[in-house]
């Protein structure tokens, strides 16, 4: 994948072609030429390009979030290193288990949740996790955004995770 630099992205103008000139001394922001072309075509709908320091701060914050999730989720294996995708899978399963437990306590005498789909155990998803991790690595212009919904509901509902894929 060819990578475009910040000044090449800004100087490319209104054309939507994927070709952008670069010099050897320009700073690389990690954006593919395709995503730069998409942002030129999209106009002002997309946010301005971040400088290198802002990108580093965002990456540091995300790594801190993953570390915190590793501490909070008791189902993560402690004897080996786990990928970010596997951390997210364990978080989803753990939140779902908590929701099922809350629902079963509120519905005295019944078990299960309100029609929540049955999820396969993690051991059967290892192949899918590996494939997804390869896909995420190959699509560097996409991010997964985690959003906690407790504030929107006034804290009355357990938190859940929403996943959105956005192009930068």
From Swiss-Prot:
Motif (Nuclear export signal): 91-104
Main subcellular location of this protein, as a coarse class: cytoplasm
Pfam families referenced in this protein's UniProt entry, alphabetically: HLH
SMART domains: HLH (SM00353)
Keyword Nucleus tagged: yes
Cell location: Cytoplasm; Nucleus
GO MF entry, a single one: protein dimerization activity
Oligomer status and interactors: Heterodimer with other HLH proteins. Interacts with CLOCK and BMAL1. Interacts with COPS5, IFI204, GATA4 and NKX2-5.
Function of the molecule: Transcriptional regulator (lacking a basic DNA binding domain) which negatively regulates the basic helix-loop-helix (bHLH) transcription factors by forming heterodimers and inhibiting their DNA binding and transcriptional activity. Implicated in regulating a variety of cellular processes, including cellular growth, senescence, differentiation, apoptosis, angiogenesis, and neoplastic transformation. Inhibits skeletal muscle and cardiac myocyte differentiation. Regulates the circadian clock by repressing the transcriptional activator activity of the CLOCK-BMAL1 heterodimer.
Protein name from the UniProt record: DNA-binding protein inhibitor ID-1
Originating species: Mus musculus
Gene symbol of the encoding locus: Id1
